[in-house]
Regions:
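Phosphate/pyrophosphate-binding loops and the adjoining catalytic core of nucleotide-dependent enzymes
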Residues: 2-187
C-alpha cells in the first residue's frame, strides 16, 4: 500500500526554497514525508541500490532541479546514510509524475517503479522513477549523443558519449525503443 502525497504547487511542493513563504511549512512537511518515509521504503527495493543489506538512517536531497523537456521531471541527487557506514552513498534519482486520467494501460507498467501516489486537488497519480518513462530515457540518449550540458541546481549536468555510442545507437538514438529493466537481478 503506497503513501499518498498531496501536491499543492507541482514539483515545487517538495522543496521549501521553491515555494512562497506562506507555504513553506506545507513544503517542509511534504519534503520530510518524502525523505523520511517514502524514499527509505522505496530505495531498498531497487536493483541499483547498493545499501540493500544496511538500515537507512537518513536520506536527503543533495542537489535537484526541475527539468523541462517534453514534460517535467525532477533530476535529483539523493544522499543516503546507512547505519553501518560512516560515508554516505549518492544516487541519481530522476522522478516523474503520471496521472490516472492518462489511463490504466499507461499506469500499470509503472507500478513497480512507483515511490508514492500523488494527489493534486481531485486528480490522482503516481510519483515514479523517471528511468521507467520512455520519453525521459529517450531524452537522456539524445543529450548523450549531442554532448549536451544542462543547468542542475547550482551547477551543470554534462552528458557525453564515447565513439562506440554512435555505432551502437545510430543517428537517432532518441528513437530507440526503451526496455524497462527487471526489478531484481542476480549478480
Amino acid at each position: 500500500d503506497l503513501r499518498i502525497l498531496v501536491l499543492f504547487q507541482g514539483w515545487k511542493s517538495f522543496f521549501v526554497d521553491q515555494v512562497e513563504p506562506s507555504r513553506r511549512e506545507m513544503a517542509m512537511n511534504l519534503h520530510e514525508r518524502l525523505t523520511r518515509q517514502v524514499l527509505p521504503e522505496f530505495l531498498p527495493s531497487q536493483r541499483w541500490f547498493a545499501g540493500k543489506s544496511g538500515r537507512i538512517e537518513s536520506v536527503e536531497f543533495d542537489n535537484y532541479d526541475v527539468w523541462v523537456d517534453q514534460t517535467e521531471w525532477v533530476l535529483a541527487r539523493v544522499r543516503v546514510w546507512l547505519a553501518e557506514r560512516p560515508e554516505p552513498q549518492d544516487y541519481g534519482l530522476p522522478m516523474a509524475l503520471a496521472w490516472e486520467d492518462d489511463g490504466e494501460e499507461k499506469l500499470r507498467p509503472l507500478w513497480p517503479y512507483t515511490l508514492a501516489r500523488v494527489r493534486v486537488r481531485a486528480r490522482m497519480g503516481l510519483l515514479y522513477d523517471a528511468y521507467a518513462n520512455e520519453k525521459f530515457t529517450q531524452s537522456m540518449l539524445k543529450m548523450m549523443a549531442r554532448n549536451t550540458r544542462i543547468p542542475l541546481g547550482g551547477g551543470w549536468l554534462k552528458f557525453s558519449s564515447t565513439r562506440i555510442f554512435h555505432s551502437l545507437a545510430g543517428d537517432l538514438p532518441e528513437m530507440l525503443p526503451v526496455k524497462r529493466l527487471a526489478l531484481d537481478s542476480s549478480n
